[in-house]
Regions:
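DNA polymerase processivity clamps
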Residues: 1-31, 37-88, 102-222
Length: 222
């Protein structure tokens, strides 16, 4: 990965803050309203390690996080704690070109139930046994299967919508990471075909988050 992509892109415009993280296989986006309007547009990249430190501090308090941006550094204040780090330099991925919009197949899913189903079929998959999860989206059902040297696993989850019997493969951990990050009880799964990314968005269309995961090409017998 390019050094710039070890950080998170912040885009600040008016009263909106958008944060984007990417690697070679997935993209995560979260968007919030700022408590006070910024009044101008800002774009900068903060190292992920610094954000993890800020998250640890925020986890112990209800304090508001305030940041002050310099030309090469950013300063976070959280209650009585202060964190300063150097910004990353370089050209961040143009995420607007990468993140699909208006995918034709939209399925409403219960996040907890789908997470449970994928966790169950993922029990026979490990870092050494990197078999994909084979997902088949039908009419109001999602069928998940996995095969490894340990054995086979199968689970079914109820969904709302018609997936047109589409079959698509994913890295189990990447799919679970996205589902576990969703703050809602339900989300919208959006797809095009078996070789295109899956995107998870809010059912209300608010754009508060988007999680994109690239598929794994399935082989016969997997």
């Amino acid at each position: 990965a390019r050094p710039i992509h070890t950080g998170c892109l912040f885009e600040v415009a008016d009263d909106s803050i958008t944060v984007v993280a990417v690697d070679g296989y997935r993209l995560a986006l979260r968007r919030w309203k700022a408590e006070s309007p910024i009044g101008r547009t800002l774009k900068f990249v903060v190292p992920a390690a610094a954000l993890k430190e800020a998250e640890k501090i925020l986890g112990d308090t209800d304090e508001t996080c305030t940041f002050f941006l310099g030309s090469k550094h950013i300063l976070f204040t959280i209650g009585e704690a202060t964190l300063v780090c150097r910004l990353l330099e370089g050209e961040f991925l143009d995420w607007r070109r990468v993140l699909p919009q208006n995918q034709p197949i939209k399925l409403a899913v219960n996040v907890a139930k789908m997470t449970d189903s994928i966790e169950r079929v993922g029990l026979i998959i490990s870092e050494k046994l990197k078999s994909p999860v084979r997902c088949r989206f039908g009419e109001n059902t999602a069928d998940f299967r996995s095969v490894s040297t340990i054995g086979e696993a199968h689970d079914v989850c109820q969904i709302a919508g018609d997936g047109q019997d589409m079959e698509i493969g994913f890295n189990c951990r990447y799919l679970l990471d996205a589902l576990r990050a969703i703050p809602d009880s339900e989300c919208s799964l959006e797809l095009v075909n078996g070789l295109s990314p899956i995107v998870m968005n809010p059912c209300d269309g608010s754009g508060r988050y988007s999680y994109m995961v690239l598929p794994v090409r399935l082989k016969a017998g997997e």
